[in-house]
Amino acid sequence: MKRFSNNIKNMKPRKDSKWHQGYVPNNLCTKLFRSCKDEPIIYRSGLELQFIEFCESNPKVKRWASEPIAIEYYNRLSQTNKNYYPDYVIETTDGNHIIVEIKPYNQTIKPAAQCSEWLKEAWVTNTDKWKAAEEFAHKHNAKFIIVTEKFFE
C-alpha cells in the first residue's frame, strides 16, 4: 500500500466547522498501527470519532490507522489524476484488511436531478474515489467499505 505523501495531516480540525472535529489523544488509541503512533489522530466528524471508538473497543479489530494510504484516482470533473486518502484502514484479528471511508448516509446516494451543482459534483468525485478504492482493495487482497451512521444502529 502506498504511504501518503501529501499534507493532509496538516489540515487541522476547525472550530468553526459544522462537523464535530478534534484530536484523539494517542494514549487512548491502543490499536494504532505502530508507524502512526507519532502522528496526531484527527477526527473530522462525530461519525469518525464513533468509528475510532468502535475500532478501539471491538475485539475483532487488531489494529487501525487514520488516513494512512494514498490511492490515485481519475477525477472526471477536473479530468486529472488525484490522490484520495481513505479515512481508515483496519486489520482484523483474522488477518483481513479493510479500507474504510466514513460518510453520512445521505452522501452515499445519488442526488436528485434538482439538487445543487455542488452536491452533484461531490457525488461524481466521491464515486470516482470509491471506484478507485475498490480496485485498489481488490489488487491488494483487501476490502473497501463505506461506513455511515447506519453502521452503528
Specify the residue positions occupied by each region the protein language model found.
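Electrostatic, structured charged patches in enzyme active sites and in nucleic-acid/phosphate-binding
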Residues: 1-153
